[in-house]
Amino acid sequence: MIELSTVSKVFHQGRPNEFRALREVSLTLARGGVTVFKGPSGSGKTTLLTLIGALARPTSGRITLNGRLLSNLPERFLTDVRRHTFGFVFQQFNLLRGLTVLENVMLPAYPLGRPYRQLVSAAQALLEQFGLGEKAANQVEWLSGGEAQRTALARALINNPTVIIADEPTAHLDSARSREVLALLGELAAQDRTVFISSHDPLVFEAVSVNRLIELQDGRIVADSPC
């Protein structure tokens, strides 16, 4: 379970261009299911996901994971929690050009020191699961948008995380590919993982796999409802 208590995030604090991205957000996120954070650009949904996923620290407030306070952990401990707990799918995919599909999937696992052969086997199995087995040796720049998105999903799973965070996962996809990705995320939730999605895509809000919809506006939660 993840809990946020009066969490705020301020960028450029004390400067003329100060920006309050989140304003005293309190939230309890239970394990399992698919939770979608919706809102227009600048509403704070992506910032909220970066805090939940321990990619950034709040300016004020507390964040706990299964009762453990994360918001004041030293960076090396926070990094360890992030690597073992969370898998990330970024809006721009963040695949490294010049590397193969297989090499991209393996990247997040290198710091954990797994044996190389074991890592290759795990990455190949994930690519097979996502219908990309035959693309393993291809350079990522040759992939279609849908293939790149599935590669990003496979990479997010390489460390077997319990929580998947997807920022605008359908942003660059047509309706058919969007439904495919949402189905894959739903399958992950069915495997006892927790899935958090930020989006302003109606296809995401209406997906049958979504259990909870949280709406943000100007850095505040303005609606929170089960689906």
Where do the language-model regions lie?
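ABC ATPase NBD coupling module
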Residues: 19, 70-87, 190
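Helix-to-loop junction immediately C-terminal to a conserved catalytic motif
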Residues: 53
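Conserved ABC transporter NBD signature motif
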Residues: 61-69
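Conserved ABC ATPase signature
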Residues: 139-143, 147-149
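Catalytic Walker B motif of ABC-type/P-loop ATPase nucleotide-binding domains
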Residues: 164-167
